[in-house]
Amino acid sequence: MAEFLDSEAEESEEEEELDVNERKRLKKLKAAVSDSSEEEEDDEERLREELKDLIDDNPIEEDDGSGYDSDGVGSGKKRKKHEDDDLDDRLEDDDYDLIEENLGVKVERRKRFKRLRRIHDNESDGEEQHVDEGLVREQIAEQLFDENDESIGHRSERSHREADDYDDVDTESDADDFIVDDNGRPIAEKKKKRRPIFTDASLQEGQDIFGVDFDYDDFSKYEEDDYEDDSEGDEYDEDLGVGDDTRVKKKKALKKKVVKKTIFDIYEPSELKRGHFTDMDNEIRKTDIPERMQLREVPVTPVPEGSDELDLEAEWIYKYAFCKHTVSEQEKPESREKMRKPPTTVNKIKQTLEFIRNQQLEVPFIAFYRKEYVKPELNIDDLWKVYYYDGIWCQLNERKRKLKVLFEKMRQFQLDTLCADTDQPVPDDVRLILDSDFERLADVQSMEELKDVHMYFLLNYSHELPRMQAEQRRKAIQERREAKARRQAAAAENGDDAAEAIVVPEPEDDDDPELIDYQLKQASNSSPYAVFRKAGICGFAKHFGLTPEQYAENLRDNYQRNEITQESIGPTELAKQYLSPRFMTTDEVIHAAKYVVARQLAQEPLLRKTMREVYFDRARINIRPTKNGMVLIDENSPVYSMKYVAKKPVSDLFGDQFIKLMMAEEEKLLEITFLEEFEGNACANGTPGDYVEESKALYQLDQFAKHVQEWNKLRAECVQLALQKWVIPDLIKELRSTLHEEAQQFVLRSCTGKLYKWLKVAPYKPQLPPDFGYEEWSTLRGIRVLGLAYDPDHSVAAFCAVTTVEGDISDYLRLPNILKRKNSYNLEEKAQKLADLRKLSDFIKMKKPHIVVIGAESRDAQNIQADIKEILHELETSEQFPPIEVEIIDNELAKIYANSKKGESDFKEYPPLLKQAASLARKMQDPLVEYSQLCDADDEILCLRYHPLQERVPREQLLEQLSLQFINRTSEVGLDINLMVQNSRTINLLQYICGLGPRKGQALLKLLKQSNQRLENRTQLVTVCHLGPRVFINCSGFIKIDTSSLGDSTEAYVEVLDGSRVHPETYEWARKMAIDAMEYDDEETNPAGALEEILESPERLKDLDLDAFAVELERQGFGSKSITLYDIRNELSCLYKDYRTPYTKPSAEELFDMLTKETPDSFYVGKCVTAMVTGFTYRRPQGDQLDSANPVRLDSNESWQCPFCHKDDFPELSEVWNHFDANACPGQPSGVRVRLENGLPGFIHIKNLSDRQVRNPEERVRVSQMIHVRIIKIDIDRFSVECSSRTADLKDVNNEWRPRRDNYYDYVTEEQDNRKVSDAKARALKRKIYARRVIAHPSFFNKSYAEVVAMLAEADQGEVALRPSSKSKDHLTATWKVADDIFQHIDVREEGKENDFSLGRSLWIGTEEFEDLDEIIARHIMPMALAARELIQYKYYKPNMVTGDENERDVMEKLLREEKANDPKKIHYFFTASRAMPGKFLLSYLPKTKVRHEYVTVMPEGYRFRGQIFDTVNSLLRWFKEHWLDPTATPASASASNLTPLHLMRPPPTISSSSQTSLGPQAPYSVTGSVTGGTPRSGISSAVGGGGSSAYSITQSITGYGTSGSSAPGAGVSSSHYGSSSTPSFGAINTPYTPSGQTPFMTPYTPHASQTPRYGHNVPSPSSQSSSSQRHHYGSSSGTGSTPRYHDMGGGGGGGVGGGGGSNAYSMQPHHQQRAKENLDWQLANDAWARRRPQQHQSHQSYHAQQQHHHSQQQPHMGMSMNMGITMSLGRGTGGGGGGGYGSTPVNDYSTGGGHNRGMSSKASVRSTPRTNASPHSMNLGDATPLYDEN
């Protein structure tokens, strides 16, 4: 068992060697012992003994035959025990007495740790106790190290052998050797130090507890038994007793076994998987097969000897991997021709498969050491392709084998069934399985064909499968019974004792055949084909003349290979023979027969294979933009060139085009249609026809008899039905998938190609002068690199770092002013820059780097490069420095590394820029090693940018393909194993060594660190690292050992070839070559000496005749080794020569892309971009031009104009000449300077500035102006562009700049669509727009339908906005938000209008009259909004997420069925807001199997459901749950019964405003509805409208209705219970609305109030609060005629409401039944409310107190807090001073302006106090009783 801690309880001075964490753990253990044994507190020696009992892992080998084996922690670990480990510390005193009596020796009794025992006691009692991490770890240690002998099995010999390798050379003191046990063995043996191995904290914790090599099998035994004896020591082996006098110990009562904690209980599964600690990982490590072969999706399996599978597979791979063309064009023709493989490739593929499958050799090994068998046809990429296709072949073969077994079982079942009754004929619906079916299955070559065969099998035999399985089950049971009877009979012959001794466990199968049939009974197949087959229609189908197989052969060969067998009677006459109760007429029989024949044709594998080949070759697509696509797809879109495409062959798609099209389709920008019509075969005249029509002709009989023509017609219909309904739609799905996969493969190849270019670069090698011999500049051991990283922000300091030759950071420098300018006019800035340059110069002089690299962050890198070059030039002169290059390199890798977990762990204290600098320097030292830093468990290598579409390919595939590049490159370069152990930078490359992987590499590294020794030769990979033979053969050639560094440090034989690419299997040949080259005699043979000499003079190898040597080797049976011998010669010439491409400077284009962060795809000539004008350029006049200058006199103002700069304010001619002489003339304007968005400077020549002639560019543009330009030239050397802003160029009139259109571009359709769009715009302009109104109300907007909907989209639920109606001038529309994206539009009719622009004196919704807009909102819309919110907050409400063409009922039905599946006992129901009918809620419920849908309509009176009105959700649900079984009418869609159309509205009754108002439940009103993006209903048109004020928020309390007289009831004013706020905004929270003193419907048309208030002008945020003194005023101070702005509603004057006195208020939500009985006007309503008020107030006083306390805490929380019991004052206060308005609203909730404290809620109206979900009260809102028992 591995050690628990590094220390084995040494003295305190020994503990100093432990790290901090280990010291803490040791202290915990000491404290535990101290607590449990206070009497021995001062006895340190006793403490050491106790600690040894717990954590000492010193191994002891025991020879008593108890047989410890390797079921312990690791495969090579011995059982490590203390001298008394064999005694369980849980033994009681009497147990010790018994053991001592039997053993005859005195046993030392250990004390038990009380704290650890307390854990056991608590757990055994079943109590859940919180145990800290330390206690858990100690408990696990106790469980692991205190197990008895019986819990451990036998160890293998290999475990004993491996255990020795793990022990270190350090031993304890010599005195320990004299302490022996009874058998004379030393107690203390070797021990070793252990260092933390895992960087991850959780994995290190696991190592601390279990040791490095713990085995998960050890922990499985802890979970085997549920019960055990309380003491394991109670039972003991009889062999330990003395003689036969053994006593039997009574067993203690069994009790629940303590649940042992394993590693799986402590660590998360994701952590175990990340660290490769699962059982599967352990198995992979142990198996002697390359790790990647084990991890392949289809593991590599050997081929049986004598099988021809490899020949078949090689042919298959050659055909499908190297010859078969892709459907789309993935390679250019020249590349495709270059990649074509000759037929000789088949043998090379077969040999490769032999290596892979039978010899388990990985691809890199084959590519490097079996070249003779694969070259020249197959390179390493081809070998990986063979490896990949081998997986597909194995998977295909396995599936074919399973299907073949199914075929054989079915054929045997058919044989048994027919043999049971040989007299009966074969039924018509039975198709016998023939040998041809097995042949067809054997000929399957692809997964698609296999799927076809499988579907054909299911079509014909699926109905027989249950019976076949039942018969097989019956046979198996019968065989078991017979076998049992035979055993019993045989046992009876041998006697009863033998019979009793035979115990055979019986399977838990029920032998009852009836039960078997019941268990196998499946759901009846109710498909049309199954119904028709049962009705006997399959017999009729056999009379159509050809079997499906025969017709498929005709179709394949494209001629009538099989003649049609024609019936002598017509189909109608024949159909009469098949009439049945199911099919009463011949038409029904014929219709069924057509379906059966068509279905059989569609499932015929040969037909589908033929159709697939033809369709994939000839398929075409149409592409059309959607409405959004027509607008959003511009010339910068990747699919612009294919915006309109007609009949484009899919074979013409190139590269990743289809992924781009799919992305546009997913974004609803394009519609891709695969045409079902495609070309047939060419006719005699050369013009192909339609393929489907040609297919019909192959099923026709060329005769003219009537009944023949009838049969021909039926056959043609069958063919058309089969192809167009089933075959072609299926092929379209396959084709889409194939095109997508091919485009993904293109992206993968692009990604790997990019990584290949990055990894193929060799470490930088400076070119020092030949005569430069200074030792400090030597590059033999490597180079020093200075890396510099900066941020374009000048306020961020730059950093540079210098690496040593090993890659460590030796020093760094902070440069805060390196980006500043040396020639700056700011003297301080200049001095700072020079100081940084001096520091950098001193730094370079001290560190002497071989090269300086700068991160390509921006163009500032070029300035830094110039500064450093100047420094280095000075150092060359003054310090005799060699020429040092300064390079600018890509910094993408450095930036990702700086933010990666690896970078964080490597440099925890470094800032990101310093990490970047270190990564830049290391990248120059070795790009492969630096890129491998991102190859960790988090797969950060995927963060690099390889391709714009890399996110569109599966992550696993991309990671696998990138790994192949690392494998190839690591195999080419090799890995120094000893250097890797010393320097962790190369650790990540170990997993890419051939034969290894993350798991095997991790184990190898662990062993090397444990042994703490260097590998001296490759043989130690087997002897020390325990690699198996297969893995060793694969990896040994790629692991190099620097033999020169070993020197004299080892006595072992040093093999110089271990430092070369020569594989150990060819060492003898290399030695032979060296001996022959040195011309040694056989007697004088010294291979080692010969090799050393040949390495010093490798030119002597050129004299060898390697071809003759190869022939001799082949003659001796070693195979062809010609290429290998030449490789050995090259390797001996230069050991492990680096074949990577030397570093080269970036080209001008590469540097341009790096510094601008652009690519040729993102920045190109012709692109339209935006630019900012930075200045103007002029061409100064030269001497001759000045002499011939001719100033112009302007007649308009009698002034003179300069002929060059066109300045025209010179009063005298002499001043023009003075203008020239003073050199003040800038010259003639030549162009405009601009700066692009990416920072590049640009220039617009004056001729390209405009289509018209421009003489002065300053008249056209100004500095800092943003303009659109088109790039017409890119100068990559000067990092500048030339642009044009001419209208003709921007519109690209001549089609010379925009991306080239596709060859199949549909210009005709594009023109038609553009014409439709322009016509629609013209019609929209001509359409009559709504009349703008002059209505002073914060919720009124002069906006169109679309504008209002867009405005309300972000508003809270229940927000309302009123707007002009497009119906007529005497109509308004009230739009309120029902739910997200669902809006209801209510038509409001006006009467008594003074003019077209004013508000009517009376407003009507249906037959109900309202006085003003406030009353509509407060009495009609707000109650509905509150009712809707109560439903939305109900727990069984589901948001309406329906999009596109989905049906909301279907969505709810799917949701209900999912819930029903989870809990079938309940009747589930849900509400959702209806999009089809806004204002209604869909109630869907699932009683049994059919989902029912009904509508609940929100009304001002409550909820209308099944013609009844309910005031609360509770009452609605209570009634619904009692009457849900009552018959209901089917809910109609949007119709007149639900929505009253505007043109069918009943005329209003002629009643005055003071007459009674109908509040009945059926009061009609006109309602329309819409959702976002929809079209206004009932004539509501979208038109361009003006501004507006503010939407009315239902979260605002209505404090009064403004009237113009004091005769209105309730003239006093009441205040809401909200806190004060004077800054309301749209959707404001908890802010009451106070209307202005101006009555809305009496608004005169006055000049000072003619402007409609604008919404959104200086609107404060909802969260802003202000005091009562913060008020704003608009208009006159008195308030009359003033129009308040949205943020000025608290304004002063008499316009405010909320002055003194009134106390009458009206409850928003009185019970609808009471209101219906009381015919009251507004005054009577006030009185009635006052009468009801005391009854309600008393019963709800405590409730309001609770609510007041709750809302005082919750009020600022959410946007829909609405903590209000709504109270309305009916008084219209026109007088009163500045006491009104928001500022004076009292903060105290539930207090009115008159000082009356009144409750706002009643039992009859729960909605009057809405709560948010954050409130605890909302948890109980609504009836929580389910339709059925929820439990």
From Swiss-Prot:
Residues 1689-1703, 1772-1783 have a biased composition (Gly residues). Residues 45-55, 119-140, 151-163, 470-482 have a biased composition (Basic and acidic residues). One of its GO terms (biological process) is follicle cell of egg chamber development. The modification Phosphoserine is found at S34, S36, S37, S66, S70, S75, S124, S151, S156, S159, S173, S1661, S1664, S1815. Residues 1565-1575, 1631-1641, 1799-1818 have a biased composition (Polar residues). It is found in: Nucleus. One of its GO terms (cellular component) is euchromatin. The modification Phosphothreonine is found at T171. Disulfide bonds: none annotated. Belongs to the SPT6 family. This is Transcription elongation factor SPT6.
